[in-house]
Amino acid sequence: MTITLGQSTKNDKDLFDTMDDWLRRDRFLFVGWSGLLLFPCAYFALGGWFTGTTFVTSWYTHGLASSYLEGCNFLTAAVSTPANSLAHSLLLLWGPEAQGDFTRWCKLGGLWTFVALHGAFGLIGFMLRQFELARSVQLRPYNAIAFSAPIAVFVSVFFIYPLGQSGWFFAPSFGVAAIFRFILFFQGFHNWTLNPFHMMGVSGVLGAALLCAIHGATVENTLFEDGDGANTFRAFNPTQSEETYSMVTANRFWSQIFGVAFSNKRWLHFFMLFVPVTGLWMSALGVVGLALNLRAYDFVSQEIRASEDPEFETFYTKNILLNEGIRAWMAAQDQPHENLIFPEEVLPRGNAL
């Protein structure tokens, strides 16, 4: 009986192993399995947006000009939402609405659903890319977790909110001025600025900006001197073994300024991660609430007193009047199919207007 020891010369790699080797190969631009989702979706989302803002009108959906071809500029061009009558249709090119006609598909607002869906999956692909790379180089996945916050905001605003309303029509169009108009709509119809979830979101974003400014300035203030390193490209050497700045000095400085300071870098940087991510998550949760038409804070006692006493007015009651004005003007403009007509006598009046 003979036993042969050794490796088989037969190549046992299957198709999956071959693809895995190619996708995760060390190259200038990492592809990875996540790239199969990220790159095509990002390409189609950006391509659809550039196509729409360059050529496609919103006349048939909003009664507006929205492309460079019609005279818009970068701030006023947009890929606008489908008409309200199309409700929540996916508006597939081969669907019953467009029936394979590309021109009709563009007129109906098909580019919006195209850009929104590919954009959402592109963002998810980018988050998965961070997970994949972190796993490959044995890092923890906090970058991907942090990026989940803007994804949550995007999905809640562009998908969850219009799904709770009557159609995609009530989502934001993809354009600068269009987003501004959507913000005004949110304020007028939902009193968004007085929503506690919006307040948490603003606190998170502005708090994160403050933390970044303080952290960057503190690091610059407490850099260790390293000879000529600050004046040469040695200052950018990514493999230095020593610390870049003095945490002890920074701690003493802020202890004297505020009376309290971060005692270690782990807690400091976790806090810088926690503040903006939690703020954005809370904003996304608030938008989900708006999809269900949940109300913001209402100070009804002030409204009742203001209606009875012409000399009593607060910033809150002034804002309520402004919201009523926004609703009165926007409803008639945004929903012409409803034939909404507001006589002069029912339009809001007050010091705010």
From Swiss-Prot:
GO terms for cellular component: chloroplast thylakoid membrane; photosystem II. PSII is composed of 1 copy each of membrane proteins PsbA, PsbB, PsbC, PsbD, PsbE, PsbF, PsbH, PsbI, PsbJ, PsbK, PsbL, PsbM, PsbT, PsbX, PsbY, PsbZ, Psb30/Ycf12, at least 3 peripheral proteins of the oxygen-evolving complex and a large number of cofactors. It forms dimeric complexes. One of its GO terms (biological process) is photosynthetic electron transport in photosystem II. HAMAP family: PSII_PsbD_D2 (MF_01383). The gene is psbD. It is a multi-pass membrane protein. The keyword RNA-binding does not apply. The keyword Cell inner membrane does not apply. Chlorophyll a PD2 binds at residue 198. The chain crosses the membrane at residues 41-61, 125-141, 153-166, 208-228, 279-295. Photosystem II (PSII) is a light-driven water:plastoquinone oxidoreductase that uses light energy to abstract electrons from H(2)O, generating O(2) and a proton gradient subsequently used for ATP formation. It consists of a core antenna complex that captures photons, and an electron transfer chain that converts photonic excitation into a charge separation. The D1/D2 (PsbA/PsbD) reaction center heterodimer binds P680, the primary electron donor of PSII as well as several subsequent electron acceptors. D2 is needed for assembly of a stable PSII complex. It is found in: Plastid membrane. It comes from Cuscuta gronovii. A plastoquinone binds at residues 215, 262. This is Photosystem II D2 protein. Chlorophyll a ChlzD2 binds at residue 118. Pheophytin a binds at residues 130, 143. Fe cation binds at residues 215, 269. It catalyses: 2 a plastoquinone + 4 hnu + 2 H2O = 2 a plastoquinol + O2. 2 of the reaction center chlorophylls (ChlD1 and ChlD2) are entirely coordinated by water. The modification Phosphothreonine is found at residue 2. Belongs to the reaction center PufL/M/PsbA/D family. The modification N-acetylthreonine is found at residue 2. Keywords: Acetylation, Chlorophyll, Chromophore, Electron transport, Iron, Magnesium, Membrane, Metal-binding, Oxidoreductase, Phosphoprotein, Photosynthesis, Photosystem II, Plastid, Transmembrane, Transmembrane helix, Transport.
